[in-house]
Amino acid sequence: MKILLTGATGYIGRALVAELVRQNFIISAAVRQKNSLFPNEVKQFVVGDFERNPDFSASLVEIDCVIHLAGKAHVIDKAKVSVLKGFHKINTELTLNLAKQAAMAGVNRFIFLSSIRVNGNKSTKPFLEDDVPNPQEPYAISKH
């Protein structure tokens, strides 16, 4: 199976790359810039700045599955409107753009990892699959 991975340099992404390579999947990583830390087995596609809604078409050729981990977790400008806009651009618009491009390229599966934060900030018991999302802050809203 040929997999395109975004967010491959992040915390989860690095671990996932190692495991997928170990299991002999064919991995491509859509990255902002080349990264020398990837194993040689990982093909890198430089798509540039994710805030500019990049064209992923070259990286989607012959891909069976997209695993989308990339996202914005921190914004420096703390004005609430700016923060939400910054998160929305990457966590919502980029995700939708990539999903549309993947569908147009004939990709069979699109896996998107979100965040537990979409369920709210506090709970005294574990969240359940049928719980209604209750995002409380701009990051969580953008991941919902």
Could you tell me what each predicted segment is?
Residues 30-35, 49-50:
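N-terminal Rossmann-fold cofactor-binding loop
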Residues 6, 30, 66-72, 110-115:
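SDR active-site strand-loop-helix element
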Residues 3-23:
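N-terminal Rossmann NAD(P)H-binding glycine-rich loop of SDR-like oxidoreductase domains
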Residues 39, 43, 47-93, 101-104, ...:
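NAD(P)H-binding glycine-rich loop region in Rossmannoid oxidoreductase-like domains
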Residues 142:
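Active-site helix of classical SDR
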Residues 96-139:
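Conserved Rossmann-fold NAD(P)-dependent oxidoreductase catalytic core, especially the SDR/UDP-sugar
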Residues 2, 26-27, 108-109:
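Residues at the starts of beta-strands that form the adenosine-phosphate
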Residues 34, 74, 117:
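Short, glycine/serine-rich, charged loops/turns that create anion-binding
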